[in-house]
């Protein structure tokens, strides 16, 4: 059986991928580039447990994950589907080369904000960014992991009927499952290797 076609029109996947590709040259760098991170990628799946963050940050001094949170309004203009999308970019950093994680996170957050509010930013979007905001997501549990996290949120109109090259997406090879039956009970963990 061959892999079936998957029509992504009407989704925010293309917009997120465009934002990631725009931010990569601005924010990705080597370990000694303290105002940059190791990876900029589209945020997918749950990411609300300390173990998830710790696993993703392993062997990284920092990273940025971009996600669409919601589409607040849809419209058709010239036969195209346009959506007003609320985005978030999470900035993760660790202490590096004697510089604190908190300082690095603030600096990288500032670079991210400056790059998306530039007049020529995100040329494939339908509109300029609006309602840009950044927040320090400090809490004791995250601090114990040795990580600082900031978020940058904004709204922007994007075409939602763009097709994406499915070959550009990560392969869906494994499916991980963690089931919680009740509080303080052992979890059910599993990993399934999917046929390709």
Give residue ranges: language-model regions.
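Acidic-leaning, charged glycine-interspersed low-complexity segments
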Residues: 26, 60-61, 102-165
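Extended, charge-rich C-terminal regions with high alpha-helical propensity
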Residues: 140-196
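A short, terminal or domain-edge coil/loop segment
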Residues: 84-106, 178-196
